[in-house]
């Protein structure tokens, strides 16, 4: 790609139609994506003598090529722009760091509907309630619903293969529709309807119906049933008393913004059916010299318009900032949703109070983030001084976790100049080594991580190896043998070993596998950042190992039983609804599983009991 960009010749070929443009540097990397109602007019503005900002000057100085894509409408250009931003992640665009789809509560369309958490495309038949700000909020709500309305939450594979009710039925958190005769179709359908009304924000209707049923049961002298319904009423009231509810019953997203010291926080409040489902703070990646208007406009566009987000659009969006393209945004969102979406920047009444709440939350979150960054910057600066490096802009740390050599998992965590970069944390399943050989595990993960091409901006300044001299020797050996296109001599390899008592503050650091290490004072900021990244790596490895161990735990106790191979194990677990159900089953119930004889059922029963 040419290093010299002929702007005059390029502009002669550009159309005045709407479209999207992509700017490339000399290395062929997309550095900026933009849209325009008039491509020629917009692109010409980059090559004037008096540019608007230093950011634009720096961008233009790097341009080696510009590609344009003409679109039929400005709305189409807006949608394409944000899809390109998501695809290329250009360094001069404002970037939304968190692009995970939001979770919903899913009420299936089965004969006996189930409740579950759902992310992604909504292909399954049923109803979706949300979005919720995170998975924790969904799980908390599902646990609450299970206590109040005992609708099943088990997978269909478990539900269809049960011959006896599970533990959830025994503790009163499921009506047991899997077993005939435990609950009538009418009663189960009634509880499902309560769930539907409750999630739709119609608490008053739920209470009205429950009170009527309680009074009817009482008049019929069915006092146990009346007492059970009374408990449901009290539970619903306790929940609704805690909720911040709007009288309007509207669906709103409320977006507050705070901007300070080159950092932005966008706080989104999710309101559905008049209830605040939750909120979340975002810290978009903001290139230096970017104005607040561009931050807000780009964030809102990426938040709602990027194709894979699977975001459910509310009827109205309240914004804490006046947008130049408010009409275009509203039209694009309406086209995407297939219904009218209103974008409001100057609300009154309750809506103004919502916006004030979002603004306050954004400011509070930004203040906290800036304080945390100040601390991490000081610690990284102190570490750079100790290690005699100009700066530490990126660190990576590795740890190994296993139980007696089984289910070995290696973790890699990444810190940049702002601290933990969790989107880049990775786990590696280690295979093909002698069980318990941590050195071989470290050797394998380092080769997998670094034995390939790496972007220049992702080459770490420091690689921290948890485990001391032996593990550091493995790292040195791996790097000596690497044949890669990037500078393998750039990262500083640093080993860290805990003291004999494994207490924080007694760590020994090693530059080389031979000789003596050195220790830092317990109050050293450099030591604190080392402890931080090492603990993150340790936790990440352990959580990955536990997940892997839990995955095989359900089958491990069956693997030792003669005559029970993989297919029979799968059939047993599927038919009995998991290992817990199998452990509770009688010989007769086990013998009903297809492919299991009475003799084998006895063997399975006694093996699990003893």
Curated annotation (Swiss-Prot):
GO terms for biological process: nucleotide-excision repair; SOS response. One of its GO terms (cellular component) is cytoplasm. GO terms for molecular function: DNA binding; excinuclease ABC activity. Pfam families: GIY-YIG, HHH_5, UVR, UvrC_RNaseH, UvrC_RNaseH_dom. It is found in: Cytoplasm. Its main location: cytoplasm. It comes from the Bacteria. SMART domains: GIYc (SM00465), HhH1 (SM00278). CDD domains: GIY-YIG_UvrC_Cho. Residues 204-239 form the UVR domain. Keywords: Cytoplasm, DNA damage, DNA excision, DNA repair, Excision nuclease, SOS response. The keyword DNA repair applies. Residues 540-559 are annotated as: Disordered. InterPro entries: GIY-YIG_endonuc, GIY-YIG_endonuc_sf, GIY-YIG_UvrC_Cho, Hlx-hairpin-Hlx_DNA-bd_motif, RuvA_2-like, UVR_dom, UVR_dom_sf, UvrABC_protein_C. Residues 543-552 have a biased composition (Basic residues). HAMAP family: UvrC. Interacts with UvrB in an incision complex. The UvrABC repair system catalyzes the recognition and processing of DNA lesions. UvrC both incises the 5' and 3' sides of the lesion. The N-terminal half is responsible for the 3' incision and the C-terminal half is responsible for the 5' incision. This is UvrABC system protein C. It comes from Klebsiella pneumoniae (strain 342). The gene is uvrC.
């Amino acid at each position: 790609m040419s290093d010299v960009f002929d702007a005059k010749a390029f502009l002669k070929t550009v159309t005045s139609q709407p479209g999207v443009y992509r700017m490339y540097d000399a290395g062929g990397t997309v550095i900026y994506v933009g849209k325009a109602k008039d491509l020629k007019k917009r692109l010409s503005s980059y090559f004037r003598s008096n540019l608007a900002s230093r950011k634009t000057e720096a961008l233009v100085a790097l341009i080696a090529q510009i590609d344009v894509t003409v679109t039929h409408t400005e709305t189409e250009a807006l949608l394409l722009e944000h899809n390109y931003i998501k695809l290329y992640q250009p360094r001069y665009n404002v970037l939304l760091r968190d692009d995970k789809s939001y979770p919903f509560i899913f009420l299936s369309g089965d004969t006996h509907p189930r409740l579950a958490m759902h992310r992604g495309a909504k292909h399954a038949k049923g109803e979706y309630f949300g979005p919720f700000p995170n998975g924790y909020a969904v799980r908390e709500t599902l646990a609450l619903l299970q206590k109040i309305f005992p609708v099943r939450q088990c997978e269909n594979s478990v539900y269809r293969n049960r011959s006896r009710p599970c533990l959830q039925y025994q503790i009163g958190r499921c009506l047991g529709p899997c077993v005939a005769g435990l609950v009538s179709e009418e009663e189960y359908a009634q509880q499902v309807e309560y769930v539907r009304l409750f999630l739709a924000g119609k608490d008053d209707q739920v209470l009205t119906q429950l009170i009527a049923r309680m009074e009817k049961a009482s008049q019929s002298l069915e006092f146990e049933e009346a007492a059970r319904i009374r408990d449901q009423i009290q539970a619903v009231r306790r929940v609704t008393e805690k909720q911040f509810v709007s009288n309007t019953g509207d669906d709103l997203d409320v977006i507050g913004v705070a901007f300070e010291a080159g950092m932005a926080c966008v706080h989104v409040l999710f309101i559905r059916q008049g209830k605040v489902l939750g909120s979340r703070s975002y810290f978009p990646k903001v290139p230096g010299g970017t104005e607040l208007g561009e931050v807000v406009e780009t964030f809102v566009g990426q938040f709602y318009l990027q194709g894979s987000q699977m975001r459910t659009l509310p009827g109205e969006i309240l914004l804490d900032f006046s947008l130049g393209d408010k009409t275009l945004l509203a039209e694009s969102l309406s086209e995407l949703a297939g219904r009218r979406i209103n974008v409001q920047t100057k609300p009154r009444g309750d809506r103004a109070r919502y916006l004030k709440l979002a603004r306050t939350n954004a400011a509070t979150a930004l203040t906290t983030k800036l304080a945390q960054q100040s601390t991490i910057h000081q610690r990284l600066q102190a570490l750079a001084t100790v290690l005699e490096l100009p700066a530490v802009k990126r660190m990576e740390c590795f740890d190994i976790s296993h139980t007696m050599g089984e289910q070995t998992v290696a973790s890699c965590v990444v810190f940049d100049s702002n601290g933990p970069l969790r989107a880049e944390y990775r786990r590696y399943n280690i295979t093909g080594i002698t069980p318990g050989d941590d050195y071989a595990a470290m050797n394998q993960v380092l080769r997998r991580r670094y034995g390939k091409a790496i972007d220049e901006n992702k080459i770490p300044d420091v690689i921290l190896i948890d485990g001391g001299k032996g593990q550091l020797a493995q790292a040195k050996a791996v790097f000596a043998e690497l044949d890669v296109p990037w500078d393998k001599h750039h990262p500083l390899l640093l080993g860290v070993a805990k003291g004999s008592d494994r207490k924080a503050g007694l760590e020994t650091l090693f530059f080389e596998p031979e000789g003596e290490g050195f220790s830092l004072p317990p109050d050293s900021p450099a030591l604190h950042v080392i402890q931080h990244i090492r603990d993150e790596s340790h936790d990440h490895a352990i959580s990955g190992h536990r997940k892997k161990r839990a995955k095989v735990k359900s089958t491990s106790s069956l693997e030792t039983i003669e005559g029970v191979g993989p297919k029979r194990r799968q059939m047993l677990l599927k038919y009995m609804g998991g290992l817990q159900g199998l452990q509770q089953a009688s010989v007769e119930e086990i013998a009903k599983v297809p492919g299991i004889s009475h003799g084998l059922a006895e063997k399975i029963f006694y093996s699990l009991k003893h």
